[in-house]
Amino acid sequence: MVQNASGYDYHGYHAMDFSKVDCRYQGITGEDAGKTGDEMFQELINAAHAKGIKIILDIVLNHTGNFGEAKLMPEFSRDQDIRNQAAIDVCMQPNYDVLPSGYLEENGAAQYQARLALMKNTDGQNHDKNNYWHHVGNSWNWDEPTRWWGQIAGDCVNLNTETPAVDEYLIQCYEKFIKMGVDGFRIDTSGHIAPLTFNTAFIPEFKALGVKYASKRLLAGQTTPAPF
């Protein structure tokens, strides 16, 4: 639901901006023309509630995509006028304040490594000074703590949810959806977040938001039993 960026994105698990609804939901024709994704989603919530239908949002706390994140590491801006992001190089506008000047002249593999370095310091430089992402490899073992720190896929870069600023930002962004009227969350890849972090940083905050907005909220996490 949030703004995504990925050459393989079809399911919405590659956030590049947790604070806004993906531009592919924006209005394009008739009376909806010019409406933002946020406005269209609000109308959907209102229409569903008018018919007694609940809206459960699939959310991600564990990772971003590999194109940075608008507030944590703004590697790109998204051309809001291009709905189809299959041609990722067309709809993504590089931010050369952080990306190398020759980024677009590099091949795909080199571009990926340049993006990843800004989030995980994989080139040996301290780009991620605030530790917003975990700086470990892509491999992980379901039975070891690496499942909480390792990157689960090339397209999903593991957020450092042990950094309070990351947790606060995510909670702030998802509070917006509660205010809009979303009735519950299905929390993706919760099994890849350390239980102590999940149970102390996220669950109490979401419960408090449910009380704040005078409504019970459904929290459900995704887990996968070993062996993976």
Positions of predicted regions on the chain:
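Hydrophobic faces of well-ordered beta-strands that scaffold small-molecule active sites
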Residues: I55-L57, F185, A214-S215, A220, ...
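Noncatalytic carbohydrate-binding groove/subsite architecture in carbohydrate-active enzymes
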Residues: T223
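Acidic-and-aromatic substrate-binding clefts and catalytic sites of carbohydrate-active enzymes
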Residues: G191-T197
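Substrate-binding/active-site clefts of carbohydrate-active enzymes
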Residues: M1-M180, T197-Y213
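Short, surface-exposed connector motifs at secondary-structure boundaries
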Residues: M180-R186
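Glycine-rich nucleotide phosphate-binding loop and flanking beta-alpha elements
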Residues: H63, F185, I193
